[in-house]
Regions:
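Ribonuclease/tRNase effector modules and their secretory precursors
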Residues: 1-83
Length: 83
């Protein structure tokens, strides 16, 4: 998987893969969150990318990302709220 937004390969942690299965998030949806979702940065390399999918009932989907030489997906959340 490759992120056009960050121009890097995407690596999904085992934890994030488990959460994706539990929450019914496909690789395609995850890439859409990463590439076209809104972003909030904690610092230069840590961020939350999030996006609403109208067909889903669980509010925003969010991917917790670390930007290294690749985009590392640490976890995937649903029912995400932006404060």
């Amino acid at each position: 998987m490759f992120s056009q937004r960050f121009q890097r390969l995407v690596v999904i942690s085992n934890h994030a893969k488990i959460r994706m299965v539990e929450r019914g998030v496909s690789a395609e949806m995850l890439l859409e969150v990463i590439d076209s979702g809104d972003a909030r940065y904690k610092d230069a390399t840590h961020l939350w990318a999030f996006k609403a999918f109208p067909e889903r009932y669980d509010n925003l989907l969010c991917a917790v990302l670390v930007l290294e030489d690749r985009v590392v997906v640490k976890t995937v959340m649903h029912h995400f709220l932006v404060l």
